[in-house]
Amino acid sequence: MSGLLFLLLLNYNNYQCHIPKNLIIMRKYLLLSFVFALISFLSSCQKEESVAEYIPFRSEKDGKWGFINLDGDVLLEDEFKREPTIVSNDRFFAKNKAGYWEMYTADKNARQVGKDYVQAGAFIEDVAPVVEKGKAIDFIDKNGKVRFTLGNVDGVAITSCRNFTDGLAIFKCGGYYGAIDASGNVVIKPDYLALESAKDGKFIGVHNKYKGVKDRSKVKITVLDTSGKVLSEFPLAKISDGVDYFCDDVLAVAKEGTDGNNYWGLINEKGEWILHVSHKIRSIKGMRNGKFIFSDGEQCGLMDFNGEVLIRPKYSNIKFTGANQLFVLDDHIDPQWKLITEEEDVISPNEFDEVYPLPGDKYFVKDDGDSWIIIDDKGKEVKTKVDIYEFSYNQGDTEFESQYLDFTSFINELHIKKDGLLGLNLTMKVADVIKSFSFLDKQYGEGDFSDNASSYRCSNDISVDLNFNNVKFQIAALFDDNVADYTFSSGFSNISPNQISVTFYNEKLLKGHLSQLTRSLKAKLKKVGTIVKETEYALIVASGNAYYFVGSDGDKVYLNYGNFDVNAINLNMFTGIDDAVTTTSDSYADDADYVDSVCLDSAVAY
């Protein structure tokens, strides 16, 4: 699964366009975070113990949630309407009816501690990540005290992070990834285009020195330990897909065969083959103690790191347990799971409809009926006083986004220069603008963007809607003529824009902060140009061979660079007060009428 990360990275690296360096971020981060969290839990190296002291459960389909441990002890029953997190470090989180997380003590009284949080994650370490409304990412202790806050690294704001894995939490800063320890110290500097926990005390990443490198054979994967020390690098070209996780210093990888299919093998941290890829191995599902579960494309078996088949592929599925045992799914008319040893000795005659192995020597299984039971490593049922209709290993949020916007850092990332912004200028041709906008859309797009000339018939503008680090805005380029040939025989016209504009919306991180954004933009423009005229909520400066304009109507902030009639613009129309019908980025017709009304003339982009 994690091979997707590097596939996305390569697609990004192979695309060259006029985009500022710090604006390039992989938008797939959230999905990959979830994928890796799932991999870490369901198919990890099986060495770590569960951090869960109690697990959320409910006795009925629509019942309230309580907590139970794997010994069958019930902490609370029928207490919470909304699914809480696991109990770890004697604390858990549950959402209130307003949708905010609250932290509680793990006892019969379940006393609330701390504040209300927009986001919260379980105590994987002695501190847990939380986000209060309008604030940056904090890490709190079990008493709700903030131990440290993620601010910036070398002046660049930290915009997101994940919960801890192997003692480190990966964060994103200026489009690059690094990692902190449980004290908030930066252990891995944000120098990586991609960074993932690879389990077994190791992390894998791709250094930003490879940004823009087209030749796959020249890109290397970096292996780091939890102190941030680089252990090794090996060529990305050595594998085609499927970098997974380390176990016993071995990494499962896939390489494309001559038939176009991926086949799996094992390498060490230096990239040396421990077990060469084999047509017998179409996927690797889990590793433990020098062995791994594999699939031949149809059935699953067990193999050791030397390539010896210990269990031939004959089961529909196999899962490691936490006690050096296996759950296997027989492929017969009514498939059932059974618990066996690695030598295929049956531990219990009972068979199960569903199984959910956890770290340790007890597991959730479902027999006939709707309820789950807990069994031990001998297959014996653990007695409980409640029915378990549903249980959860919910760890809360796994991706945390700062709700604090550092305006200085954000405006720096707009790359406002004397002759343009966001890497765009008035000398670029239509095709260049399309390439730049297309790339931005792939990274941060929040609408439909077309890079096909046929989509721009009779059009003299190009625009793209973006959500960058939870800031919503639209970029547009306006032209004096049609951007595409009427016949489409030659594609895009060979003309340059007369104006570039950005429209910021009163949504997400900017909600309620447009006045501050306007002030910050005005301050920036005064540094790059000469003031032509100014009011409290608007400004025009001469810069390069054109003009910058910024203005706020209270509903949006408009930032333009281009050739327009400054005398025709009435800055007093920009009052910073929302006295018009509220519009969003989905209401472009209303926006157009409004722009015409404030005399920015027909060339003004909005």
Where are the regions a protein language model picked out?
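Sec-dependent N-terminal signal peptides
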Residues: 29-39
